[in-house]
Amino acid sequence: MRRLNGVFICLILFITKISYAKDKGANGDMVNIVAFGEGRCSDTSYWMKWHWLPMWRMLGSTGRINFDYHPYGIKTTCVDSESADDVVCDCHHGNRECLLNQLQACVIEALPNFEDYMEVVTCIQGKQNISMAAEVCFEGPTKLDRTKMMECAESRHGRKLFSDQENIVAQMAPEMDWAPWILINGTRYKEAEEDLWQFLCDRFIDPRPIHCPKKIVY
């Protein structure tokens, strides 16, 4: 009788394991992507326009991708002002980049969900200055007020939002020496800069969605 009970328990465990594997395969594992970039960096601008937006438009509907973007790059520092009541930042590509980064940080605060802020943040990316960005990036159904976003970007609050990104870099990407810097499930992959959509399909998204291109052997 004990032997029969043991066989029965093993059978139940085996069936449960198969059921779990099927459920996991049907739903797929979540892929967590975190990217860091600079507002006036041409490499960041190219990647956002030709890689992350197309990737999201093709794979976002799968519900298997989490994405976070942080407007903070290399050779960037933020320190408290002498009065300690403000923040002074110095950016890789000058003050215009700091302001663009601050504007992006304000947008992300106002629209914390990636799918809501990604189009606006991408629009801001690479613009000559925040005035040009504000002129074209807050039209349509963005749910954002142009004046309020500009005020935020040029305020102490906007500078603080931007400077807070430095702590995130220190925690998640202390070795960052390039922008854009892309982490997938906590690890940096340079291949994700070159063809994000293809790389995700080939290495991380299983089962493979029908939207994916033909697999490449790495």
From Swiss-Prot:
GO molecular function: oxidoreductase activity; oxidoreductase activity, acting on a sulfur group of donors, disulfide as acceptor
Localization of this protein: Secreted
Major site of localization recorded for this protein: secreted
Keywords: Glycoprotein, Secreted, Signal
Signal peptide (residue range): 1-21
Family: Belongs to the GILT family.
Protein name: GILT-like protein ZK669.3
Source organism (scientific name): Caenorhabditis elegans
Source lineage: Eukaryota, Metazoa, Ecdysozoa, Nematoda, Chromadorea
